[in-house]
Amino acid sequence: MKKIFIMSIITMLSSLLSCQAQNKSYKSLSADDYEKAITDTTVIRLDVRTAEEFADGHIRGAINIDVLKSDFEQKATATLPTSKTIAVNCRSGKRSKNAAAILTKNGYKVIELDSGFNGWQAAGKEIVK
């Protein structure tokens, strides 16, 4: 009985560890590190906020695909080449983490702005309207 219990615990722990490793297959970066990363001209800047939020201001060179839309995955995979690194941002960092998970599941290399567009603005980084 003890062996079964111990084996169950080991199985559960290894499952949790493998899930955690899969969930973090993208890099979350500070505003300063994100800014450095997107200076690479091969990196595609993706803003996953709504069209209205994007129109109010965004990071220079970003394209907009709303992660809240049901066709996000389809649009993103049809638009973005898997050969490029995708730099994702949203307003606060929550939606970009969801988008990053979807993109990495589809074979993309992804970096994500941890503090979102709000953190980008608070750090005094350039925005365009």
Where are these regions (language model features)?
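Structural scaffold elements adjacent to functional motifs in cytosolic proteins
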Residues: 45-47
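Rhodanese-like catalytic fold shared by cysteine-dependent sulfurtransferases
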Residues: 2-5, 19-37, 43, 52-85, ...
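Short, surface-exposed ligand- or partner-binding patches at beta-edge/loop junctions that are enriched
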Residues: 89
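Bacterial N-terminal signal peptides
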Residues: 7-16
